[in-house]
Amino acid sequence: MAHYFVGDIQGCFAELQKLLAKVDFNPSRDELWAVGDLVARGPDSLATLRFFRSLGDSAKTVLGNHDLHLMALHGKLKRAKPSDNLTEILESPDISASIDWLRQQPLMRELPEHQLIMSHAGVPPQWSLEVLREEAALVSCALKQDDYLEALIAQMYSDSAEQWDPSAIGIERLRYCINALTRMRYLYVDGRLDFDCKQPPENCTNPQLKPWFEFVSPLRQSHTLVFGHWAALMGNVGDTKLKALDTGCCWGEHLTLWHLEKDQKITQKKLKKS
């Protein structure tokens, strides 16, 4: 069995299919792991989501910020922007089933036999594996409740939860977890999340900011961390135990697939419109 990890697809379904054909992906024997953001911006979010649902246990994804945004749009909590490119999926007859499927997906996944953790944006350096498991599980539990829209999705949009506080309770605790696992790029030197800078490290002009993965972290030493979200990195992090897989396909660059067992990356350039 092969484990394939794919970067932010964001509706780039044709490129995904090209990649899977290159490696002869077979769901009866292989697994496809996605770092989140299955939807938004790209041309075919609906086909992407339906494909992942069809794979059953052969597909493993985590939630990204755009996947959570889709829940908010479906719940009429936010107004869609043209750049979201989600009209087709929101008007699809199986949108409720798609949302229910997304609600069952976690914010982090583990592959213990390979000492591997996958999340959309990364892992806060302050967290141990036990804390990561606990905090992600709290969000997953909230998403599965009948009142998830009012209790979580409607209140998750906030930059106030920028600092990890183990004594926080309720929505503030959940907000930090969502912010950290789906939105994080840079941290201030005191550990606070920054929500503004998206540049690669070599272009960041604020001396108070460092990429989250440059902080000392117990998980950075013990595990391979697989993440997406930060397209400007283009996969370049200078550490073999960090797998940054968002390579900007929806922005005209390429989609990246990582074969775990071979430690090999395969790419597919963004296809030109016919």
Curated annotation (Swiss-Prot):
- Which catalytic reaction applies to this protein? P(1),P(4)-bis(5'-adenosyl) tetraphosphate + H2O = 2 ADP + 2 H(+)
The similarity annotation says:
Belongs to the Ap4A hydrolase family.
Q: What would be an example GO MF term here?
A: phosphatase activity
Q: What is this protein called?
A: Bis(5'-nucleosyl)-tetraphosphatase, symmetrical
Q: Please report a single Pfam family linked to this protein.
A: Metallophos
The UniProt record lists the keyword rRNA-binding: no
Any GO BP: RNA decapping
